[in-house]
């Protein structure tokens, strides 16, 4: 037993000003004795005598301390030691032979959950005493002994009178291999006095260092530092809390010291100075010198082990990093301390039959909600935005204590599957995020198992931490709860629809969830959105699918932010708002929503099931996954660019059932929209082609609604909706001609003598040639250039069309002023005015009824200016690229060997190479945190182009040419027929009925009629929502 003493008044002084007036810095010279009997010198005794007792020590007799202990103390110690009051002795019991971890009686669980540990310096050379032998004080009111040992580290816990916890560790008997790379004393896993308080639990508070500190020292709880709050992130519940971020000056290999505040007197290289405050340069360098670069510390020692397969499958339970465990508030269950890896060697459809299973099923838990997050190569910011949004939603479910379904342990009923499309496509820093959360570990996965190719790598872990889009860690102190995660890293890139097949056909049959939710990385569900989606299924047993409101990310509150300064973002914001307010609500009332956005939608799992013959929604949904060449018609291939539309139709028209689809206004998901023109054009190419051919598919199979299990009233609404969709599709087909006809009529009408505009005829001819030339240029660009390679050409076309729109709007105002003046004398003019008022009045009134009118102010003008871009450029590019429907790399049949293989042995086991040392696992964890902090440049290999079969390309290009020819000719014929009349006399005072005048009236009435139908549907939706609460 080793005894040492301290002044009884020290604790009182510390409690008064939260600073220890008796800072104590241990030194090896305080250790005296010989052999197994080693004593610690009391630094407060001026005589240097030691209080001693027996203490088992690995140290030799070579160094009996003879130096005066006062010589190594800082000046403050030398000044106060003479004034030290009576001594009070505490005891610590340490038994290095004890291999079991023991706890001090009488201390609460919070003591151990809050105590941190620090790695000591390397062991001394032979015949030398260790410079890292530390002492720690126990509370004056406690005499209970404390002993502990974890893998050779003996931890001395201390608690000040003010209730501040700390700990020190002393290594004994470590391998030289591990000691060479040991972390410095103030490692990121230790807890010291913090410059900023970070809302610890009430059981412990931030306080002083275990030894006290000299003036000027500022410790950080590495790797965190306080930063200015970013109000762009929707973290309402954290508004009162300071933010924590990964600091660049942490113990992870930074240049400015080992976890110290670089602005303090002891930050940076000053800690390793030749003659520091602590005197001895060897002492300073041992404890506070700069750590070697992280890259030089990588050991990656792997050991070959024989592992018995589980029913023929490779399944490993891997311990999580030590540092991660110190952050956790729950450590009792295996799901928090081990990560489960499964090497899946079968097709998704055979997952259950090949004896694979999932952790929640092993625990016997019922899965109420199963959430799929699909991603491809998105970066860590988009991933964390989605991930943290889901975690906050799960926390809300657990806060509903009065719910029969949810409550305190509601997180056990929610499982989140993160499915990444291609191991070599995933963003490296997303893997760092998952590693920081404990979900992913490098070096575990394998390419082959007993001669079978691995199709997907499954990592299962229940995390208690989250990382938001600012890369700030959040945990239980922010009200978050654990989340069960299944990370499916597909070996090959096989498109998003294949990711959904893993979700629906592999994982769902194991967990049998009630409701499934589909999310894309980059979409952030707002705090209660997932609950509102789930509630729509709970209230109505006939609901098979539901979606929320998809909002464009504007980086501001109430949908108003700096991104609206980008006209592309503003136009998309207006488009999203009108679609949600008018289209989704109308379709919801009828019972069939043409598309539940894959970015944020929900489905009842039982409604998705196929019948006994294998026919049903999921069978139709996955039909187009492996279509190749001319064996697949162009309609089917393009249709599966909008695969979510197929799933919606198959649900609503399912034979013998009466499933309906609902829009849930309260469930909001915020998503990034393209900010650049090339990305915008490429995205809309997929959307337009997919939606067009999916609409053709739905119209062709309208009879399935009649054979469904809906009642007569619902069937009538569904048939009417099909007719409504057909009329809209026809109108959109002739959109290219309609816009040009209106431009030609409005501008040519200014040539009427009553306007008294000289030279306007010549100007109009010039503008009309500019218009037609831009349209022809758009065809040429679309046929021969990718938007990414012709960015400025496309921007020039967008600007020209916007200027032409301005001219057309000026002409429209002048013509409208004349129309208003002649309303009483000409019925046709009156119909024009009424149609225009009805169209724009619907936008205004419906937005006001929905309590969401801001988009009319912030985004309407931008949408008008970009309207010709939507009608001309986007449609031209989409139709001219019907042959391009691929999402990824088809035909990728190569087998990678970079992860290694699992080889069978003669003893019925397999030989596998794994990182076994805990230090290697911990080092990999530190690397992940370091990568998130520094964000190193990602170097990707050259993208390989997928090989296309000649007949496949010929077939699709031939279809493309036929469709474009039919579309262009039909629009040209319509324009020529209408404009063959007297366009200049459309608004003439002479009156009379002309072809152009009749055409304008019919188009305006049609647009107004469609708007009124949507307005009626929107109003009915709001009424039903109000009645149902």
Curated annotation (Swiss-Prot):
Segments of skewed composition (Polar residues): 76-91
Membrane-spanning intervals of the chain: 723-743, 760-780, 796-816, 830-850, 860-880, 963-983, 998-1018
Glycosylation sites: 37, 401, 514, 527, 689
Cited Pfam families: Chitin_synth_1, Chitin_synth_1N
Signal peptide interval: none
GO molecular function terms noted in the UniProt entry: chitin synthase activity
Domain of life assignment: Eukaryota
Its EC number(s): 2.4.1.16
Gene Ontology biological-process annotations: cell wall organization; chitin biosynthetic process
Regulation: induction: Expression is up-regulated in the mycelial form and shows a maximal expression in the log phase at about 14-18 h of incubation.
Region spans: Disordered: 1-29, 46-105, 168-209
Cellular component annotations (GO), alphabetically ordered: cell periphery; cell septum; cytoplasmic vesicle membrane; plasma membrane
Location within or outside the cell: Cell membrane; Cytoplasmic vesicle membrane
Similarity comment: Belongs to the chitin synthase family. Class I subfamily.
Keywords: Cell membrane, Cell wall biogenesis/degradation, Cytoplasmic vesicle, Glycoprotein, Glycosyltransferase, Membrane, Transferase, Transmembrane, Transmembrane helix
Topology term for the membrane: Multi-pass membrane protein
Function: Polymerizes chitin, a structural polymer of the cell wall and septum, by transferring the sugar moiety of UDP-GlcNAc to the non-reducing end of the growing chitin polymer.
Reaction equations catalysed: [(1->4)-N-acetyl-beta-D-glucosaminyl](n) + UDP-N-acetyl-alpha-D-glucosamine = [(1->4)-N-acetyl-beta-D-glucosaminyl](n+1) + UDP + H(+)
InterPro entries: Chitin_synth, Chitin_synth_fun, Chitin_synth_N, Nucleotide-diphossugar_trans
Listed Low complexity bias regions: 46-71
Protein name in the entry: Chitin synthase 3
Compositional bias ranges of the Basic and acidic residues kind: 191-202
């Amino acid at each position: 037993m080793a005894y040492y003493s301290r002044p009884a008044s020290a604790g009182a002084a510390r409690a008064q000003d939260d600073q220890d007036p008796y800072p104590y810095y241990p030194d090896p010279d305080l250790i005296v004795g010989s052999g197994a009997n080693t004593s610690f010198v009391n630094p407060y005794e001026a005589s240097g005598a030691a209080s001693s007792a027996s203490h088992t020590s690995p140290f030799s007799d070579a160094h009996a301390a003879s130096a005066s202990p006062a010589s190594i103390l800082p000046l403050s110690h030398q000044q106060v030691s003479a004034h030290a009051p009576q001594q009070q002795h505490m005891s610590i019991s340490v038994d290095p032979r004890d291999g079991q971890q023991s706890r001090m009686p009488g201390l609460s669980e919070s003591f151990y959950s809050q105590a941190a540990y620090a790695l000591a310096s390397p062991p001394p050379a032979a015949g030398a005493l260790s410079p890292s032998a530390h002492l720690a004080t126990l509370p004056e009111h406690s005499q209970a002994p404390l002993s502990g040992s974890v893998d050779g580290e003996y931890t001395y816990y201390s608690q000040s009178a003010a209730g501040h916890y700390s700990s020190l560790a002393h290594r004994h008997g470590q391998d030289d291999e591990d000691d060479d790379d040991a972390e410095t004393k103030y490692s990121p896993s230790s807890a010291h006095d913090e410059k900023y308080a970070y809302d610890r639990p009430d059981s412990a508070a931030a306080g002083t260092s275990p030894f006290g500190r000299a003036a000027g020292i500022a410790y950080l709880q590495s790797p965190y530092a306080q930063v200015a709050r970013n109000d762009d992130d929707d973290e309402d519940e954290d508004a009162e809390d300071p933010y924590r971020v990964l600091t660049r000056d942490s113990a992870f290999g930074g240049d400015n010291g080992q976890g110290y505040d670089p602005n303090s007197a002891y930050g940076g290289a000053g800690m390793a100075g030749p003659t520091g405050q602590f005197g001895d340069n060897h002492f300073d360098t041992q404890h506070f010198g700069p750590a070697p670069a992280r890259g030089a510390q990588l050991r990656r020692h792997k050991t070959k082990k024989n592992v018995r397969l589980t029913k023929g499958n490779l399944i490993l339970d891997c311990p999580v990093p030590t540092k991660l465990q110190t952050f956790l508030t729950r450590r009792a269950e295996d799901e928090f301390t081990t990560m489960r890896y499964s090497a899946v060697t079968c097709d998704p459809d055979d997952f259950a039959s090949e004896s694979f299973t999932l952790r929640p099923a092993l625990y016997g838990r019922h899965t109420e909600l199963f959430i799929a997050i699909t991603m491809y190569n998105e970066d860590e910011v988009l991933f964390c935005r989605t991930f943290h949004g889901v975690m906050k939603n799960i926390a809300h479910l657990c806060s509903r204590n009065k719910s029969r379904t949810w409550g305190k342990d509601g997180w056990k009923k929610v499982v989140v599957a993160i499915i990444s499309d291609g191991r070599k496509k995933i963003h490296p820093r997303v893997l760092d995020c998952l590693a920081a959360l404990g979900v992913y570990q490098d070096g575990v996965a394998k390419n082959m198992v007993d001669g079978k190719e691995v199709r997907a790598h499954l990592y299962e872990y229940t995390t208690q931490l989250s990382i938001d889009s600012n890369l700030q860690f959040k945990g239980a102190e922010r009200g978050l709860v654990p989340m069960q995660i299944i990370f499916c890293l597909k070996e090959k890139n096989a498109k998003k629809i294949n990711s959904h097949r893993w979700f629906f056909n592999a994982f769902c049959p194991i967990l049998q969830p009630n409701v499934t939710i589909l999310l894309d990385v980059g979409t952030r569900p707002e705090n209660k959105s997932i609950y509102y989606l789930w509630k729509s299924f709970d209230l109505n047993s006939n609901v098979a699918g539901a979606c929320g409101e998809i909002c464009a990310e504007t980086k501001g509150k109430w949908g108003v932010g700096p991104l609206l300064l980008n006209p592309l973002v503003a136009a998309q914001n207006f488009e999203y708002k009108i679609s949600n307010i008018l289209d989704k609500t109308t379709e919801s009332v009828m019972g069939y929503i043409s598309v539940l956005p894959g970015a944020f939608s929900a489905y009842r799992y039982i409604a998705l099931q196929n019948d006994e013959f294998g026919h049903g929604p999921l069978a139709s949904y996955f039909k187009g996954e492996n279509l190749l060449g001319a064996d697949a018609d162009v309609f089917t291939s393009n249709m599966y660019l909008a695969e979510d539309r197929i799933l919606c139709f198959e649900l609503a028209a399912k034979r013998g059932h009466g499933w309906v689809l609902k829009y849930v206004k309260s469930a909001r998901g915020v998503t990034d929209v393209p900010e650049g023109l090339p990305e915008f054009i490429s995205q809309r190419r997929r959307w337009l082609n997919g939606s067009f051919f999916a609409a053709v598919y739905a119209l062709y199979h309208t009879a399935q609604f009649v054979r469904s299990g809906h009642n007569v009233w619902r069937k009538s609404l569904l048939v009417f909706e099909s007719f409504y969709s057909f009329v809209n599709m026809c109108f959109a087909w002739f959109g290219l001609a309609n816009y040009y006809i209106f431009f030609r009529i409005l501008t040519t009408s200014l040539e009427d003598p009553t306007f008294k505009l000289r030279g306007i005829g010549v100007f109009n001819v010039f503008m009309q040639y500019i218009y037609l030339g831009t349209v022809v240029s758009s065809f040429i660009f679309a046929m021969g250039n990718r938007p990414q390679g012709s960015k400025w050409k496309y921007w020039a076309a967008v600007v020209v069309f916007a200027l032409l729109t301005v001219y057309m709007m000026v002409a429209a105002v002048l013509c409208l002023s004349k129309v208003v003046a002649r309303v009483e004398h000409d019925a046709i003019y009156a119909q024009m005015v009424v149609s225009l008022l009805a169209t724009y009045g619907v936008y205004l009134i419906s937005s006001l009824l929905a309590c969401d009118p801001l988009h009319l102010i912030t985004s309407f003008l931008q949408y008008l200016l970009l309207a010709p871009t939507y009608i001309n450029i986007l449609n031209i590019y989409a139709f001219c690229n019907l042959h391009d429907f691929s999402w990824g790399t088809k035909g990728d049949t190569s087998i990678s060997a970079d992860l290694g293989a699992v080889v069978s042995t003669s003893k019925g086991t397999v030989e596998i190479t794994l990182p076994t040392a805990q230090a290697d696992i911990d080092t990999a964890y530190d690397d992940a945190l370091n990568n998130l902090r520094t964000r190193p440049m990602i170097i990707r290999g050259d993208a390989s182009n997928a090989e296309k079969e000649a007949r496949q390309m010929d077939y699709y290009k031939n279809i493309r040419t036929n469709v474009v020819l039919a579309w262009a000719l039909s629009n040209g014929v319509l324009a020529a027929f209408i404009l063959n009349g007297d366009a200049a006399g459309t608004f003439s005072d002479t009156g009379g009925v002309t072809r152009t005048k009749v055409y304008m009236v019919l188009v305006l009435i049609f647009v107004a009629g469609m708007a009124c139908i949507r307005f009626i549907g929107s109003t009915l939706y709001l009424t039903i929502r109000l009645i149902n609460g």
